[in-house]
């Protein structure tokens, strides 16, 4: 399937996590994961709702104990977004999560246990019509595979995934997606490429334990971006040691940068130099914060001088090009007769952007 003029998407089977389609011709979905203690029910519900408001399509919740599974039961009743139950070590927790309304089960081949336990989980998933995610991670590989290939080897992640893909296929279960995550970008990318060439199940993209807000965003953007640019990937999570809401923002920014899926404002801003006629950095940072609630796709250019300001403004929905004392406003590439006083750019530009959002929304709803 052709996504745009540059990307042809890999053909994959379509599955559903509640009402969200994954794979096939579905939009590439953005996921995040709660970092609250699951037994803190109110905090977990609150964070799930915030993630949904931020644009997450799916939220994953860790269930480390049977006690947490009881909390999950209450949490699930009080949220509407699709929830993936994240299960490690104890297969009984997966059975409980399925009973309590999970929309998908994530199991880790490296620690879920023997074949009979996997069969039990798959049997329950079949009964409940629940999809499963086979979530392979370089930090928790099966010991025999780790000894065979080592940790940061694409073949180790691939073999672990295929071992469990084969098990699920033998059990006539095809409602599953797969991830092969490593904290090493190139290992991760090559693992996904191996997997994409072998199976047609949906692939969940991510760089595991990628790091802080800054470095994790960079690593995830490179790794996930490389795969998406080759048409690989059906859903993604940007893993950051940061507020999970930032994961959603970065995820959509990656998709927007590749013209795969657009949500919210794409700010085009110059890095600034001595030619700038107003404080570009402050203007962009303040506007990004003020306009976080905008989900309508649009391009806004904020350029501090006339060198590139006119050209960028010509291609934007709303653009400002720096000029002495008063800067030039553009809408749909056309110069607006009203210049904006440089001291008032933030407030005036926000006003014009929100007005444009209303116009675009009316147009889209016609």
UniProtKB/Swiss-Prot annotation:
Its cofactor is [4Fe-4S] cluster. The keyword Nucleotidyltransferase does not apply. Its EC number is 1.17.7.3. It catalyses: (2E)-4-hydroxy-3-methylbut-2-enyl diphosphate + oxidized [flavodoxin] + H2O + 2 H(+) = 2-C-methyl-D-erythritol 2,4-cyclic diphosphate + reduced [flavodoxin]. SUPFAM superfamilies: Dihydropteroate synthetase-like, Nitrite and sulphite reductase 4Fe-4S domain-like. It is an enzyme of class 1 (oxidoreductase). GO terms for biological process: isopentenyl diphosphate biosynthetic process, methylerythritol 4-phosphate pathway; terpenoid biosynthetic process. Transmembrane segments: none annotated. One of its GO terms (molecular function) is 4-hydroxy-3-methylbut-2-enyl-diphosphate synthase activity (flavodoxin). [4Fe-4S] cluster binds at residues 270, 273, 305, 312. InterPro entries: Dihydropteroate_synth-like_sf (IPR011005), IspG_bac (IPR016425), IspG_bac-typ (IPR004588), NO2/SO3_Rdtase_4Fe4S_sf (IPR045854). Pathway: Isoprenoid biosynthesis; isopentenyl diphosphate biosynthesis via DXP pathway; isopentenyl diphosphate from 1-deoxy-D-xylulose 5-phosphate: step 5/6. Converts 2C-methyl-D-erythritol 2,4-cyclodiphosphate (ME-2,4cPP) into 1-hydroxy-2-methyl-2-(E)-butenyl 4-diphosphate. Belongs to the IspG family. This is 4-hydroxy-3-methylbut-2-en-1-yl diphosphate synthase (flavodoxin).
């Amino acid at each position: 399937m052709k996504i745009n003029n540059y990307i042809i998407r890999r053909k994959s089977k379509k599955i559903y996590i509640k009402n969200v389609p994954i794979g096939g011709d579905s939009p590439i979905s953005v996921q995040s994961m709660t970092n609250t203690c699951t037994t803190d029910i109110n905090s977990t519900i609150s964070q799930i709702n915030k993630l949904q408001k931020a644009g997450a399509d799916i939220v994953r919740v860790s269930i480390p104990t049977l006690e947490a599974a009881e909390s999950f039961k209450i949490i699930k009743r009080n949220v509407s977004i699709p929830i993936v139950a994240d299960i490690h070590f104890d297969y009984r927790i997966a059975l409980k999560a399925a009973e309590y309304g999970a929309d998908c089960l994530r199991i880790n081949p490296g620690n879920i246990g023997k074949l009979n336990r996997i069969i039990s989980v798959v049997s329950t998933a079949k009964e409940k019509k629940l999809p499963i995610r086979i979530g392979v991670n370089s930090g928790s590989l099966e010991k025999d595979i780790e000894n065979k290939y080592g940790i940061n080897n694409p073949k180790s992640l691939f073999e672990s995934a295929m071992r469990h893909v084969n098990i699920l296929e033998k059990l006539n279960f095809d409602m599953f997606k797969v991830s092969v995550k490593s904290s090493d970008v190139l290992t991760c990318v090559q693992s996904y490429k191996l997997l994409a060439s072998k199976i047609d199940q949906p692939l969940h993209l991510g760089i595991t334990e990628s790091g802080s807000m800054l470095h994790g965003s960079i690593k995830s953007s490179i790794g996930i971006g490389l795969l998406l640019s080759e048409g690989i990937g059906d859903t993604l999570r940007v893993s950051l040691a940061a507020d999970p809401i930032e994961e959603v923002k970065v995820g959509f920014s990656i998709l927007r940068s590749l013209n795969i899926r657009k949500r919210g404002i794409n700010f085009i801003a110059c890095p600034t130099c001595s030619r700038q006629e107003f404080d570009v950095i402050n203007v962009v940072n303040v506007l990004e914060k003020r306009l976080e609630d905008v989900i309508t796709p649009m391009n806004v250019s904020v350029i501090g001088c006339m060198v590139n300001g006119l050209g960028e403004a010509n291609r934007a929905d709303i653009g400002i090009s720096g000029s002495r004392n008063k800067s030039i406003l553009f809408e749909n590439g056309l110069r607006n007769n009203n210049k904006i006083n440089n001291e008032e750019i933030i407030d005036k530009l926000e006003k014009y952007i929100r007005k444009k959002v209303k116009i675009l929304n009316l147009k889209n709803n016609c």
